[in-house]
From Swiss-Prot:
Alphabetized GO MF terms: 6,7-dimethyl-8-ribityllumazine synthase activity
Record field: catalytic activity: (2S)-2-hydroxy-3-oxobutyl phosphate + 5-amino-6-(D-ribitylamino)uracil = 6,7-dimethyl-8-(1-D-ribityl)lumazine + phosphate + 2 H2O + H(+)
Record HAMAP family: Lumazine_synth (MF_00178)
Gene Ontology CC annotations of this record: cytoplasm; cytosol; riboflavin synthase complex
Pathway the protein contributes to: Cofactor biosynthesis; riboflavin biosynthesis; riboflavin from 2-hydroxy-3-oxobutyl phosphate and 5-amino-6-(D-ribitylamino)uracil: step 1/2
Pfam families on file: DMRL_synthase
Record keyword DNA damage present: no
Binding, (2S)-2-hydroxy-3-oxobutyl phosphate: 84-85, 125
Originating gene: ribH
Gene Ontology biological-process entries: riboflavin biosynthetic process
Annotated binding of 5-amino-6-(D-ribitylamino)uracil, by residue: 23, 55-57, 79-81, 111
EC number of the protein: 2.5.1.78
Positions of the catalytic residues: 87
UniProt-recorded name of the protein: 6,7-dimethyl-8-ribityllumazine synthase
Length: 151
């Protein structure tokens, strides 16, 4: 017998934490706006927004939020731009560790941190030409919470 599990995007009753970087705030605020609108569209009413200085500081806050067991998912939003950050590789590498925290705590941790070469690319991914990656991250969080509940 083959069984296929497929989750929907109904977020009613879910509680999410959004951790957003203040660095490159003109980008991250657009990502946050997209995420909050997406949550609203999917029926999520309970969202906690946590602001951190930058993407480098996210793993510590993600770990604390995951360990608290208060949330169904954690969404990380940020923008690391190669041209604007001399230590791009270090910051991008540290922020990429976020996913392992989710596995460790059995909670969906969604990586919505843009890593781009230019400011223009980041702007495109924050709500112009390439959609809004914050909105996509929020929808992914809702779906993953529902999927894990099916397992």
């Amino acid at each position: 017998m083959i069984q296929e599990l497929k989750a929907d995007l109904n977020g009613k009753g879910q509680k999410h934490c959004v951790i957003v970087s203040r660095f490159n705030e003109f980008i991250t605020e657009s990502l946050l706006k997209g995420a909050l609108e997406s949550f609203r569209m999917h029926g999520v009413e309970d969202v906690t927004v946590v602001r951190v200085p930058g993407a480098y500081e996210m793993p510590m806050v993600v770990s604390k939020a995951a360990a608290s067991k208060k949330y169904d998912s954690i969404v990380c939003l940020g923008a690391v731009i190669r041209g604007a950050t001399a230590h791009f590789d270090l910051v991008a590498g540290e922020s990429a560790k976020i996913g392992s925290i989710g596995v460790q705590h059995s909670i969906p941790v969604i990586f919505g941190v843009l890593t781009t070469d230019t400011i223009e690319q980041a702007i495109e991914r924050a709500g112009t030409k390439a959609g809004n990656k914050g909105a996509e991250a929020a929808a992914t969080a809702v779906e993953m919470v529902n999927l894990l509940s099916l397992l």
